[in-house]
Regions:
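Sequence-pattern detector for short linear motifs
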Residues: 8-9, 198
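Bacterial N-terminal signal peptides that target proteins for export
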Residues: 1-8
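Eukaryotic scaffold repeat domains enriched in small/polar residues
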Residues: 20-362
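Bacterial N-terminal signal peptides
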Residues: 10-18
């Protein structure tokens, strides 16, 4: 009798949800970049704004909630700063929430990371993930790099408060053997450089760059990323350029960008990423977009536009960006507290890390 009653209630709930879903379906035209009549290179895929878009609610929990008339409990992204993406997982730092979120769309769950040994995460900035799945987080208040395993359990820290003024950017070799930390410094600081550490022992190895505007020097270096050919791309934000340098000698190999509001220029460069072909992606908080350059520094295209309403592809305060294994671009906006996802035209909507179906929760 109880099983029959449960089945009836579940059927009623399913019909109710199906009706709501049918009412919510709205057909929208594809948002493409670059726009017609150009050949599409990227398609807007989705916007992530809260945990309910990731977490899979169990059938029992859904039934219980409907029976008592409760709304589903979800939480927003806070003030996202940076992110990394690997194997269907989004690792995102929430600078005001003092935590790192693992948005696991494959498992359908969200993990919060707050504890860091004897410390608590305070001001998480850049996030990176090694091939082994270890999570690296720069904390601007603790002034160290925090390392966690794939489950979010604390492993160790790298660096100390006396070694940095304002650590912001982070790059990690695939095997975790070297960790690069961009120290943004400040107006009165001379620490405008990249500090390099042994990723296994935590030993400080050497520094790259100094304060200035000459090749190989930096003014407010922020986000950094390693390129497929083993070079280091540095967002030299105060000099309004991206410098590609040798990660051992610090010598400049090439540079791209200049100050300005036109395409190919930078006004407030923020997040930086690189794809498998060596193309450099740079988000700009003033321009409200991500510009894509080839490895020679030539502008290829841009994705997104500045807009004061939260529509797909509109950004008012873009920050961190990342690429997944399929070439999808994940772009944070701090003002709208969202992540917009764009897929390459060569990748289907539900291919790779977006493959369906996701597992059901019992």
């Amino acid at each position: 009798m109880l099983n029959v009653k449960k089945a009836v209630l579940m059927l009623s709930a399913a019909m109710l949800l199906q009706g709501c879903a049918q009412q919510a379906v709205v057909e929208v035209a594809d948002i493409v970049y670059p726009p017609a009549p150009n050949e599409p290179r990227f398609y807007y895929q989705e916007t992530i704004m809260h945990s309910g878009q990731i977490e899979i609610e169990s059938e029992d929990r859904m039934l219980q909630r409907i029976l008592v008339g409760q709304n589903r409990t979800v939480f927003g992204l806070g003030k996202p700063f940076d992110l990394a993406v690997k194997n269907g997982r989004i690792y995102m730092s929430d600078s005001t929430g003092q935590k790192v979120l693992i948005l696991d769309r494959v498992a359908g769950k969200v993990i919060e990371i707050r504890d860091a040994g004897f410390d608590q995460i305070s001001a998480p900035f850049a996030v990176k993930v090694s091939d082994a799945g270890d999570i690296y987080v720069v904390d601007g208040t603790l002034k160290k790099v925090l390392v966690f395993d794939e489950n979010g359990d604390f492993i160790k820290s790298i660096g100390s408060s006396d070694m940095f003024d304002k650590p912001t950017g982070l790059a990690v070799t695939a095997d975790g053997s070297k960790v690069y930390v961009a120290d943004t410094g400040g107006v009165s600081s001379q620490r405008h450089h990249v500090r390099v550490f042994n990723g296994h022992t935590g030993e400080h190895l050497y520094d790259l760059g100094s304060r200035g505007k000459e090749p190989g020097q930096f003014n407010l270096p922020k986000n950094i990323v390693l390129t497929p050919d083993g070079l280091l791309a540095v967002n030299d934000s105060g000099n309004f350029r991206i410098q590609i340098i040798d990660p051992i000698t610090g010598d400049e190999v090439r540079t791209m960008g200049s100050i300005g509001m036109s395409f190919g220029q930078f006004a407030r460069p923020k997040g930086i990423a690189v794809d498998v072909d060596g193309n450099i992606y740079v988000a700009d908080a003033q321009l409200g977009n991500t510009q894509i350059f080839n490895k020679e520094g030539q502008l290829l295209m841009h994705i997104g536009q500045r807009g004061d309403n939260n529509r797909p592809g509109n950004f008012l305060l873009p920050a961190g960006i990342a690429l997944d294994e399929d070439g999808r671009l994940y772009m944070i906006d701090q003002f709208f507290a969202k992540i917009d996802v764009f897929r390459p035209a060569s990748v289907g909507k539900y291919e790779g890390s977006f493959a369906l179906p996701r597992p059901k929760q019992k």
